[in-house]
């Protein structure tokens, strides 16, 4: 069973001078050795959580637990937590070695031990041999690695990263995503990463917290959040989406765009107003009148791996489609999608209500699915038995026919000598 390393219990943060509440009753548990991401727009409260964990801000209410100890009153330098800031906060007047060794020198660690641990840390971030290099001579990615090496040199329980990739160019940022994830897994310590970049959050994390206006709107694995957004905000914030108003006719049957469609969601009231989400990559073009409905292509952009196409249906709903096929602006085409592509969102549903509903109807599906599986297995066995019996009967018939043929041949052979004897006597 995984150990809880950090816990927030009903934590809030209010700035008294402006009476502004930036965190509202936040509660969560983080397990040791996992990669967590706090994802949200500016002002959502994500960096406030990071600073409270680091000891740079005090919580107004609630308890902050680190490694089973309440740390609300523990100074920042007494917490086994390190922070990597967006600016990296490296010392430009020191070389790489001295930057990485700084914390150990302050603690009075033996010089040989310092040299050993600096070497180990630089190897982990692939900067061995850079010990004497000036900080001012390093690239952005190399500075990032030095900051990480300095942060991990005394093996903190938790590493906090505050928008630490945002200063890098796109290619280097993608490369560092792989390196950070690999480093976290090799070290086995807890990473808490703050970003406004959805791609970074989805690519690196074991678990993502979506934040908005000081609250956690939804949390889950990257796949869960992308495939099952809880509300309009999450669906719109994570990736690109087509979001429409609709009505849940009954379980697994939804109405939108003036039509009824088979879906895979359930657990809602009949005729309940809902919102429908369909991702642009889950839609494909057909000939007119051969899909679910027709749209008219309005614009398209080439994005390298796909065309991003905007089209409008007869109700003037905008549709975003990702396609590897180029469209013709102004043409009418059909749109099609599978039932699995339709995600249903209830209006004003909390994360707790969402989780309970999903669990309830998934268990229902699993029970029905098991019964169906048993029934199908029994039917298959019965069919196999019937086939075996049929084959045995056919074999028996073939054997009977063969036996009759053999008997006829033997009888014929027995009769032939008698005929020959009669002919021989007549000749004499």
From Swiss-Prot:
Principal place of residence: membrane
Catalysed reactions listed for this entry: ATP + H2O + polyamine-[polyamine-binding protein]Side 1 = ADP + phosphate + polyamineSide 2 + [polyamine-binding protein]Side 1
Membrane topology term: Peripheral membrane protein
One Gene Ontology term of the molecular function aspect: ATP hydrolysis activity
InterPro entries given in the database record: AAA+_ATPase, ABC_SmlMolc_Importer, ABC_transporter-like_ATP-bd, ABC_transporter-like_CS, Mo/tungstate-bd_C_term_dom, P-loop_NTPase, Transp-assoc_OB_typ2
Pfam families: ABC_tran, TOBE_2
One GO cellular component term: ATP-binding cassette (ABC) transporter complex
Subcellular location as annotated: Cell membrane
UniProt keyword list: ATP-binding, Cell membrane, Membrane, Nucleotide-binding, Translocase, Transport
List of residues binding ATP: 40-47
Chain ranges of the ABC transporter domain: 6-238
UniProt EC number: 7.6.2.11
Enzyme class per UniProt: translocase
Function: Part of the ABC transporter complex PotABCD involved in spermidine/putrescine import. Responsible for energy coupling to the transport system.
Known partners and oligomeric status: The complex is composed of two ATP-binding proteins (PotA), two transmembrane proteins (PotB and PotC) and a solute-binding protein (PotD).
Family note: Belongs to the ABC transporter superfamily. Spermidine/putrescine importer (TC 3.A.1.11.1) family.
UniProt protein name: Spermidine/putrescine import ATP-binding protein PotA
Lineage: Bacteria, Bacillati, Bacillota, Bacilli, Lactobacillales
């Amino acid at each position: 069973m995984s150990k809880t390393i950090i816990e927030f219990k009903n934590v809030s943060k209010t700035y008294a001078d402006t009476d502004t509440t930036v965190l509202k009753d936040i509660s969560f548990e983080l397990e040791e050795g996992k990669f967590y991401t706090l994802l949200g727009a500016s002002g959502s409260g994500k960096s406030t959580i990071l600073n409270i964990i680091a000891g740079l801000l005090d919580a107004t209410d609630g308890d902050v637990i680190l490694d089973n100890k309440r740390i609300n009153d523990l100074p920042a330098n007494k917490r086994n937590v390190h922070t990597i800031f967006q600016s990296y906060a490296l010392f430009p007047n020191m070389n790489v070695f001295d930057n990485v060794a700084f914390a150990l020198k302050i603690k009075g660690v033996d010089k040989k031990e310092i040299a050993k641990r600096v070497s180990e840390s630089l190897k982990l971030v692939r900067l061995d041999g850079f010990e004497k290099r000036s900080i001012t001579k390093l690239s952005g990615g190399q500075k990032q690695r030095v900051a990480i090496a300095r942060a991990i040199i005394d093996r903190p329980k938790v590493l906090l990263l505050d928008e630490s990739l945002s200063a890098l160019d796109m290619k280097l940022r993608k490369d560092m995503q792989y390196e950070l994830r690999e480093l976290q897994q090799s070290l086995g310590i807890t990473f808490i990463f703050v970003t406004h970049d959805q791609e970074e959050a989805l690519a690196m994390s074991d678990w993502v917290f979506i934040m908005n206006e000081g609250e956690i709107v939804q949390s889950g694995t990257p796949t869960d959040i992308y495939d099952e957004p809880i509300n309009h905000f999450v669906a719109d914030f994570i990736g690109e989406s087509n979001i429409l108003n609709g009505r849940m006719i009954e379980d697994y049957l939804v109405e939108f765009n003036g039509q009824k469609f088979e879906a895979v969601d359930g657990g809602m009231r009949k005729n309940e107003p809902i919102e429908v989400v369909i991702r642009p990559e889950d839609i494909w073009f057909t000939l007119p009148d051969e899909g679910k409905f027709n749209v008219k292509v309005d614009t398209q952009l080439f994005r390298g791996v796909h065309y991003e196409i905007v089209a409008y249906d007869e109700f003037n709903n905008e549709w975003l489609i990702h396609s590897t096929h180029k469209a013709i602006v102004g043409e009418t085409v059909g749109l099609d999608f599978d039932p699995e592509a339709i995600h249903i969102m209830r209006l004003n549903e909390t994360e707790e209500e969402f989780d309970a509903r999903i669990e309830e109807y998934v268990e229902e599906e699993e029970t029905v699915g098991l019964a169906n599986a048993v029934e199908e297995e029994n039917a298959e066995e019965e069919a196999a038995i019937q086939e075996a019996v049929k084959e045995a009967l056919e074999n028996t018939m073939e054997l009977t026919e063969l036996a009759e043929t053999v008997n006829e041949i033997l009888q014929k052979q027995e009769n032939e000598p008698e005929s020959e004897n009669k002919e021989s006597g007549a000749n004499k």
